[in-house]
């Protein structure tokens, strides 16, 4: 089974990439609560094994993965249903580095080392600060969206990133795309078949 969670459309948003951090109407708190609610809903569905749920997210959704698995959030700590695996592609990790991160489950972070939108360094710091359940895979020369098939392009319309107001780069990196896809399949097989 697969459930695709849309935190934006029901709140009247089509995208948040061009919105400055701090002005977004859809927050990480809402996205975390959406994910926690989705776990509860999934657990109540016939044919769903609530002990075999994986949570995946990309970019802002990747940050939501971290929020939904951070035991430092009281609602996560209280959650009855938790995913067995969490995978975040190029998440923003700065907020979790500041507040502290305690993983509720096995967590895989996949990062581009050239990412100037959501840089890899804070995620590497987060993983290095002791969460024993966090694994990082990172690729040299890979930008945000490295698992895409399109070329790297500059997005001047994105106000956030390493150099605020100067835009960011986004696009595919064939080696990182292939390796991350295989890493995802391997992680899902390990987590969900035991």
Region locations from a protein language model:
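Serine-hydrolase catalytic machinery in alpha/beta-hydrolase-like enzymes
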Residues: 1-47, 148-170
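Alpha/beta-hydrolase active-site loop signature
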Residues: 9-12, 93, 143
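Primarily recognizes the serine-hydrolase "nucleophile elbow" in alpha/beta-hydrolase
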Residues: 26-103, 116
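Charged catalytic carboxylate motif
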Residues: 34, 122, 179, 183
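Short beta-strand/loop motif that positions the catalytic acidic residue
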Residues: 109-111
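Acidic catalytic loop of the alpha/beta-hydrolase fold
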Residues: 114-118, 144-145
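Short alpha-helix in the alpha/beta-hydrolase fold that links the catalytic acid
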Residues: 118-128
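C-terminal catalytic histidine-bearing segment of alpha/beta-hydrolase fold enzymes
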Residues: 133-194
């Amino acid at each position: 089974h697969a459930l695709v969670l849309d935190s934006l459309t029901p709140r009247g948003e089509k995208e948040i990439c061009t919105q400055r951090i701090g002005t977004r109407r859809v927050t990480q708190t809402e996205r975390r609560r959406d994910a926690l609610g989705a776990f509860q809903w999934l657990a109540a569905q016939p044919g769903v094994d609530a002990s075999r749920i994986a949570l995946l997210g990309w970019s802002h959704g990747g940050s939501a993965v971290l929020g939904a698995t951070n035991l430092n959030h009281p609602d996560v700590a209280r959650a009855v249903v938790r995913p067995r695996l969490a995978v975040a592609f190029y998440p923003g990790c700065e907020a979790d580095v500041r507040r502290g991160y305690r993983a509720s489950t096995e967590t895989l972070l996949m990062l581009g080392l050239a990412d100037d939108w959501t840089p890899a360094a804070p995620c590497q710091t987060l993983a290095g600060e002791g969460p024993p359940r966090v694994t990082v895979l990172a690729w040299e020369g890979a930008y945000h969206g490295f698992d895409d098939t399109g070329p790297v392009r500059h997005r001047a319309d994105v106000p956030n990133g390493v150099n605020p107001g100067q835009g960011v780069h986004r696009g595919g990196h064939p080696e990182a795309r292939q390796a991350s896809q295989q890493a995802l399949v391997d992680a899902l097989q390990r987590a969900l078949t035991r």
